[in-house]
């Protein structure tokens, strides 16, 4: 593996054992815990000036803070997504400024591309022939595209309710797909069954938190936000959350940026979930250290219908360590918030609307101040969820 000189190894979040990245493709071999990358901040030697002079955009711009060198990265030009001001929404919330980090501008229209780039790089370097994952839809399209870049096969296990565009483009990129009757947990069961088959021993899992590299890639979102704000740390970042990759990635980013001396503070990291599939919110409200399975998920926001998040405990840590909150939003409020952002010319998705609706709740409850700078993450292109947005307008008679 062509790793950066700053990468020390992979550390288990549970037992704290350290492992060699070249010998550890998935979870901790000692206890099965989630792995994260550990870095030598001195070896990275990253400064604001060195980043300003970087010869790459996107993920490769931050390669000294990542596991793989810029030249070895499987990339389709992910990252470098716009940070768009939303002054009308800021005025409604009564805060200093609102920005939307528009992840729909990534190559396959989803923030998943950040983590997929690193995870497929690792799979290639581990000698995999095929990558596989369960997904609500968008990450399957992403995996198919990046696997094609690396000349690997891919297979996505998706529920029947997955969006047409995600399923279609998974096939267009050359990926295999198993459409599983039922909902997301049924797709997970089918994936796990396939992974346990001896005939699939050469498959490499890209399931959330199975590989350390999807949450590693996710941290670059906050790297970019900080640089785009000229290193002024925002007061709040709101992450629509399924498994927790985004908020966990931002938590890793805050720690690493402070260790590197690039910033002194961290933003409050907030989790936003649909109120009828909100296991992180429920666990936070109860003061629990981990999530419990949400028994009856029921939301129009299919990308976030994840009743048993793989990163639930880590998402709770991210919220609590940074002084954030976990907030549920109704489907109607989420769709209305997405439409309002679209009225400002920001092509927000229904998934992004969950974060915007949660920000309204945070402001109403006094958790956002009049001078605060708030970043809303729009994880998916609005065009990928146009059907549910249009249906919302039709119900209103528009």
Region locations from a protein language model:
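PLP-dependent amino-acid enzyme catalytic core
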Residues: 2-398
């Amino acid at each position: 593996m062509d790793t950066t000189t700053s990468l020390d190894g992979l550390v288990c979040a549970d037992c704290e054992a350290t492992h060699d990245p070249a010998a550890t493709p998935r979870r901790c071999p000692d206890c099965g815990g989630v792995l994260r990358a550990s870095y030598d901040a001195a070896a990275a030697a990253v400064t604001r000036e060195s980043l300003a002079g970087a010869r790459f955009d996107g993920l490769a711009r931050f390669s000294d803070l990542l596991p793989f060198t810029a030249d070895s990265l499987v990339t389709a030009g992910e990252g470098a997504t716009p940070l768009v001001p939303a002054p009308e929404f800021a005025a409604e919330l009564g805060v200093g400024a609102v920005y939307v980090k528009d992840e729909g501008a990534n190559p396959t229209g989803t923030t998943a591309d950040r983590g997929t780039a690193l995870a497929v790089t690792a799979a290639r370097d581990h000698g995999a022939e095929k990558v596989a994952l369960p997904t609500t839809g968008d990450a399957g399209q992403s995996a198919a595209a990046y696997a094609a870049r690396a000349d690997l096969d891919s297979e996505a296990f998706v529920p029947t309710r997955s969006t047409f565009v995600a399923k279609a483009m998974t096939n267009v990129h050359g990926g295999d797909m198993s459409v599983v009757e039922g909902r997301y947990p049924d797709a997970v069961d089918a994936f796990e069954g396939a992974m346990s088959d001896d005939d699939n021993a050469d498959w490499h899992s890209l399931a959330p938190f199975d590989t350390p590299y999807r949450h590693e890639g996710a941290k670059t979102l906050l790297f970019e936000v900080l640089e785009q704000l000229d290193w002024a740390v925002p007061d709040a970042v709101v992450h629509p959350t399924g498994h927790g990759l985004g908020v966990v990635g931002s938590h890793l980013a805050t720690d690493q940026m402070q260790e590197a001396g690039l910033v002194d503070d961290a933003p409050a990291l907030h989790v936003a979930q649909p109120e009828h599939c909100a296991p992180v919110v429920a666990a936070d409200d109860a003061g629990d250290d981990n999530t419990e399975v949400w028994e009856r998920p029921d939301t129009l926001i299919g990308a976030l219908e994840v009743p048993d998040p793989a990163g639930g405990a880590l998402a709770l840590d991210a919220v609590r360590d940074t002084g954030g909150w976990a907030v549920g939003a109704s489907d109607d409020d989420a769709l209305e918030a997405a439409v309002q952002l679209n009225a400002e010319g920001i092509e927000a998705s229904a998934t992004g609307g969950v974060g915007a609706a949660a920000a309204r709740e945070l402001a109403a409850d006094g958790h956002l101040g009049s001078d605060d700078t708030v970043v809303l993450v729009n994880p998916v292109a609005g065009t990928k969820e146009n059907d549910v947005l249009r249906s919302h307008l039709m119900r209103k008679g528009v």
